[in-house]
Regions:
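Metal-dependent nuclease catalytic cores that hydrolyze phosphodiester bonds in DNA/RNA
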Residues: 1-105
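Nucleic-acid nuclease catalytic cores
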Residues: 70-71, 95-189
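Short intrinsically disordered terminal tails
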Residues: 1, 192-194
């Protein structure tokens, strides 16, 4: 497999020295965020990043709870509550994956063992979007390609600002086809960009 590298500053993945699109870039046409003020969008991105980091540090046992910002705390509490109420084993966390046949990359939040099944968990701090199904399908297929092991479930975990969570199982059988359609559109636009 080609070495997968990620440049944090530019949010760019490269495989074997060639830039490959991210799952987020590929699915961008499904999420019209143009009506959201840029500063609000940036705030939401920063909040999501902080919540992801807090949950990751919590799961690795490295979190200094006194360092958690007040705005992040309810989302972390929601994750801690989910961990207590839904027993699962974490198999992988914040892992970058690359699909060599379809040439895309992404970073999944958690690969877990839940009720005897390997599942993708994608943590969310905002509203639920239809693109989350194709997003988790992309991660599922890349993980399966890399590991040779089946992933049997996909979930968007909605962490809420009141300390609660909602578990959304992604079951639409068309999610993978939607992702591949977006990938074809992404390639077409890049090929014909002026």
């Amino acid at each position: 497999m080609s070495a997968l590298l990620f440049d944090e500053a530019t949010h760019t993945y490269t495989a074997g020295g060639v830039v490959v699109p991210s799952v987020t870039q590929i699915l961008a046409p499904l999420n019209d965020l143009s009506f959201i003020k840029p500063e609000v969008l940036q705030y939401k991105r920063d909040l999501g990043t902080a919540v992801h980091k807090a949950t990751e540090l919590y799961d690795t046992g490295e979190l200094d709870e006194s360092s958690v910002a007040d705005v992040v705390r309810p989302y972390l509490d929601a994750w801690i509550r989910l961990r207590a109420e839904l027993p699962f084993e974490i198999l992988g966390m914040e892992e970058r994956v690359f699909h060599p046949a379809h040439r895309y990359a992404g970073t999944y939040d958690r690969l877990v063992q839940l009720d005897g099944k390997r599942c993708i968990f994608d943590l969310k701090t905002g509203g639920m979007f239809p693109s989350y199904g194709p997003q988790t399908a992309a991660y599922k297929n890349a993980v399966e390609k890399a590991s040779g092991k089946r992933v049997e479930g996909r979930y968007a975990i909605e962490l809420r600002d009141d300390g609660t969570y909602r578990l959304h199982e992604m079951t639409d059988p068309e999610d993978w086809q939607v992702f591949l359609g977006c990938l074809a559109l992404h390639r077409f636009k890049n090929k014909h960009a002026a």
